[in-house]
């Protein structure tokens, strides 16, 4: 089957976008992993599908697959690309665009400067929402010898405070944490260096994709954790390897993610 796709990225976090409103396209995990291969396929961090939703007052269903072919709950940078895609392809004139994910409903706001602001919803610190096997909720947890905060932004995140993100062995530490028995579903692991109360440096190792140039939900998780610990203020610029994103969060409220999106190319591929 020959399908149309668009390659997009948000701060280097890249995606294969597919219009599946007709519902006639299906992928298996092997196909997705092959397409995600950066040498033999298209190359991407996530595959994003635009599908119809049966939920009242919802415009689309937003389906997300990691590069390993497994479906996941949320992707913040992908949500920004999703909004831009459905708008530029003429699939919706709404603003905001309301989409349904595996973890709930989110609102996507298109700005005049080609950036998108995403209402990522209310974060959760409940270990059950993170699938963290601990007896009770705490401000931090010791996992594989590391002190970590844990937050759900619709998907599970652990956050580690570090002095310098450039000297951290991100891959080996993240893999060690992800393999912990306390995280049977794994988690995205963020390494946060606080520069001041309104700026952080951040690197994120995503489950199923490895370290990415940017992770929107990871930036949200890091800032939420920092605000909750009194280390950060309500508006924070997160500096990631792919660029900067703005996170807004007031304790007890929703968290918002803003940043640019970019079309890269479009084409057809046989699956």
Curated annotation (Swiss-Prot):
Pathway participation: Amino-acid biosynthesis; L-lysine biosynthesis via DAP pathway; DL-2,6-diaminopimelate from LL-2,6-diaminopimelate: step 1/1
InterPro entries per UniProt: DAP_epimerase_DapF
Residues flagged as site, Important for dimerization: 265
Compartments (UniProt record): Cytoplasm
Keywords tagged on the record: Amino-acid biosynthesis, Cytoplasm, Isomerase, Lysine biosynthesis
Regions that span the bilayer: none
NCBIfam families the UniProt entry points to: DapF
Listed name of the protein: Diaminopimelate epimerase
Gene that encodes the chain: dapF
